[in-house]
A protein has these predicted regions:
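Intrinsically disordered, polybasic Lys/Arg-rich low-complexity tracts
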Residues: 3-92, 96-98
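ATP-binding N-terminal substructure of ATP-dependent carboxylate-amine bond-forming enzymes
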Residues: 76, 80-244, 273-275, 562-601
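A conserved helix-loop-beta module that forms one wall/lid of the active-site cleft
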Residues: 228-301, 587-588
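Conserved ATP-binding module of the ATP-grasp superfamily
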Residues: 261-263, 284-290, 304-335, 391-398
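Glycine-rich phosphate-binding loop of ATP-grasp-fold ATP-dependent ligases
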Residues: 264-265, 288-312, 333-335, 358-377
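ATP-dependent carboxylate/phosphate-activation module, predominantly the ATP-grasp catalytic core
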Residues: 327-334, 338-391, 424-451
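A long amphipathic alpha-helix within ATP-dependent nucleotide-binding catalytic cores
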Residues: 366-414, 449-478, 483, 569-582
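Peripheral (often C-terminal) accessory segments that flank ATP-dependent C-N-forming ligase machineries
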Residues: 452-602
């Protein structure tokens, strides 16, 4: 493997504002009827699992900001010219080849599950290291839970795109994927569930009489029906309950009942500017207001209103809706994930967010990454936020919810007050950082408590002790991730892309590809980074399309005071270096995309 530099260079005529390196698509297939599925080289269409999925083709417009309500974000339409055939739509002949299993838990022997009650973390670790039940994560890519196979035996990722070109032993991607367009993340997961290759792969890996466990970010009632018909256990709360809890109005009401207050607000309906003023004055919210509608991406359904002109600009989206009217505060958003179990709510590490950076996303206010470091929350603020999340978890239990959820916490930078922001009742894009912390290695990754809640085993864990330990250990670790989107107004078929794997800075400061890697867990210092490619050669890129995710130790932002941050010099260098590896051929005039592949649910 050569340390090929990944420095920025002059774009070729075939590219628009970006230049590329090289990457070779591979093909992969599986034998459906054999006891062990063998991996083969796969087509070069890759993607990310997260916030929403895309269709393969000529885009139609939107952005993938962090969402908190409706999840069927848009997708692109065909970018092929009339009569042009997608070269990836043809069925490929499988070429079997052996791969070595390189994930930790895979080496553990089976031996059946203990049926006695699990009483401590050591027993939980043993339970998962000897697990005989297939546990499957479905998605466009394995981004959200990548690396979890290190702890869980028989854990597999079923994905539409394969960023490793067949080299990851725990990623299965169907070989035959005729060209089609997906409208949402739910559609791509439902397609995977019903795919013949996928079903054969799962059947071959499932012992007789055992029901596979299935998890995913995006699902709906159709997903539930498919899983029931196939004999799979969907280890997630009901889709109808999740939809109910997605409402910002419901989140506010539940938080108030639980003693987890939001920023001073009033829930109401208004028909005109005078009505909004009257409501705000009565509630003592001041003249600068923030108005939110119940469902949708935060960046698209949050409106800042301080004048009649602002009202006229946004009134069409507000009138007729039940809305949340808040006092506008100077705040710092903080993300945290938690798991609601029968023993109580376990709270993960707190993370800051990367929001709206033009180098990463064309969407103003769009989520584009996270940082975890000791100073995200300290002292009393951390304790207050932890209690806020635990109270909300207890209230969610009364609604029948159990398992994983993410919460946005708002810290008032003027008063240091901590408020409940939004609830995201599902796996989120922050999970990738949560599962790699020092706390995760001291105990188990947070998501394992979610799986445990849905397994056929009894357990009695000291949640208070776990939370105290995680608060101490997680706050001492430093990790960051950036989600990189196409920011130029182009539509191209990619001819070269950076490889998935581990990168590092060479002696001259250039970013070079060091070696293939299955995940980012082996990173040691700030000179190293892991890049997860989403789109590969033969795929398309357009303005707003997710290109990949970069994970590294250390911070990627610098604080400028009063809760404001900017991208660090190191972050900008990493972004420019990775972007320089992309090259493509223009295929159409730029068109606004209708959806995108996101990597954070929300």
């Amino acid at each position: 493997m050569t340390d090929r530099p990944v420095r920025a260079r002059r774009p070729s005529k075939a590219t628009t504002k970006t230049a590329g390196g090289r990457s070779a698509p591979a093909k992969r297939a599986t034998k459906a009827a054999t006891k062990k599925a063998t991996a083969t080289k796969a087509t070069a269409t890759k993607a990310s699992a997260t916030k929403a999925v895309t269709k393969k083709a000529r885009p139609t417009k939107t952005s993938a900001t962090k969402t908190s309500g409706t999840k069927a974000t848009p997708t692109k339409t065909s970018a092929l010219k009339g009569g042009e055939t997608d070269p990836r739509s043809a069925k490929l002949s499988p070429t079997p080849r052996e791969v070595s299993v390189g994930t930790d838990a895979a080496f553990a022997s089976g031996g059946g599950q203990p049926r006695r009650r699990l009483k401590n973390i050591s027993e939980v670790r043993h339970f998962f290291r000897t697990n005989d039940v297939p546990i499957l994560f479905f998605g466009a890519t394995p981004f959200n839970l990548l690396g979890l196979d290190r702890w869980v035996r028989n854990f597999t990722y079923i994905t539409y795109y394969d960023a490793w070109d067949g080299a990851h032993p725990r990623v299965f991607t169907p070989t035959n994927k005729p060209y089609q367009e997906f409208e949402s993340g739910e559609e791509i997961n439902n397609w995977l569930l019903t795919n013949a290759e996928v079903r054969a792969h799962i059947d071959a890996a499932t012992p007789r009489g055992v029901r596979p466990k299935v998890a995913m970010v995006f699902f709906n009632s159709e997903t539930e029906d498919i899983s029931k018909e196939l004999g799979y256990d969907l280890i997630l709360p009901a889709a109808s309950l999740r939809q109910h809890l997605d409402s910002k109005i419901v989140t506010t009401q539940l938080g108030n009942e639980a003693g987890a207050p939001s920023v001073p607000n009033v829930l109401t309906r208004v028909d005109d500017w005078a009505g909004l003023q009257a409501v705000a004055e009565k509630a003592g919210l001041g003249d600068e207001l923030v108005v939110q509608t119940p469902y949708g991406d935060s960046g698209k359904t949050t409106f800042f209103i301080s004048s009649e002109a602002d009202w006229k600009k946004h009134s069409a989206d507000i009138v007729g809706e039940e809305i949340k009217v808040m006092r506008r505060i100077n705040n710092r958003p903080v993300a945290v994930e938690a798991v609601l179990t029968r023993c109580g709510t376990i709270v993960g590490p707190f993370m800051s967010e990367l929001i709206g950076y033009k180098r990463l996303t064309p969407a103003r206010g769009g989520w584009c990454g996270n940082e975890m470091f000791p100073e995200v929350l300290t002292g009393e603020s951390r304790r207050t936020a932890t209690q806020l999340v635990r109270r909300l978890g207890d209230r969610l239990a009364e609604e029948g919810y159990r398992g994983f959820f993410e919460v946005d916490v708002l810290v008032d930078t003027d008063t240091n007050d901590v408020y409940l922001g939004e609830l995201n009742p599902r796996i989120s894009g922050a999970s990738s950082i949560t599962n790699v912390t020092a706390g995760a290695y001291a105990d188990v990754p947070l998501f394992l408590f979610h799986i445990l809640e849905y397994m056929n085993v009894d357990f009695d864990l000291d949640v208070d002790e776990i939370n105290e330990r995680w608060e101490e250990l997680a706050s001492a670790d430093v990790w960051s991730q950036m989600v990189m989107k196409e920011t130029d107004d182009i539509v191209q078929r990619l001819t070269a892309t950076p490889r998935t794997g581990q990168y590092s800075l060479d002696a001259s400061g250039g970013l070079v590809f060091r070696r293939p890697a299955l995940d980012w867990h082996q990173l040691q210092n700030e000179r190293e980074a892991f890049f997860l490619r989403i789109y590969g050669p033969g795929d398309y890129r357009w303005k707003g399309a997710d290109l990949g995710v970069l994970v590294t130790k250390g911070r990627l932002q610098v604080d400028n005071g009063q809760g404001k941050s900017s991208l660090a010099i190191r972050a900008r260098h990493l972004i420019d270096s990775i972007r320089a590896e992309y090259a493509g051929t223009p295929i159409a005039e730029p068109a606004p995309p209708r959806t995108n592949v996101g990597v954070k649910s929300g």
